[in-house]
Amino acid sequence: MKKNITKVIIASTVIATGLLTQTNDAKAFFSYEWKGLEIAKNLADQAKKDDERADKLIKEADEKNEHYKGKTVEDLYVIAKKMGKGNTIAVVKIKDGGKNGYYTFDITRPLEEHRKNIPVVKNGEIDSITWY
């Protein structure tokens, strides 16, 4: 009888250890998946904000019957991205911008943080956008 009790205790310990290990693996997997969902949600939110911002900038220019205009590099990026669906590279030329009046964007990726708040040369009127 004592031998059976020992076997039951050992078997219970092995099963409990297996369940704890499996639970920890499940927690780690869930945590990893949750972070992935948060990143995807943040990217979707940012894309929605960029789209709304581009619509606003384009609508303002159309109402005033002017060239599209941006105050920062991010404004130029969202306009080029909105208008260049299906393209990968956009080169934005600023009206009367001189030799520094060109901005190149990879519109398949988000704009880098260090480029977002850079002011645009001259008054920011877009002369042309070329897509590649």
UniProtKB/Swiss-Prot annotation:
What protein am I looking at?
FPRL1 inhibitory protein
Q: Which NCBIfam families match?
A: PRK13033.1
Keywords attached to this entry: Secreted, Signal, Virulence
Protein family: Belongs to the CHIPS/FLIPr family.
Please provide, in alphabetical order, the Gene Ontology terms of the cellular component aspect for this entry. Answer: extracellular region
Main location group? secreted
Q: Which organism is it from?
A: Staphylococcus aureus (strain MSSA476)
Q: What does this protein do?
A: May be involved in countering the first line of host defense mechanisms. Impairs the leukocyte response to FPRL1 agonists by binding directly to host FPRL1.
Keyword Manganese carried by entry? no
User: Where is this gene product found?
Assistant: Secreted
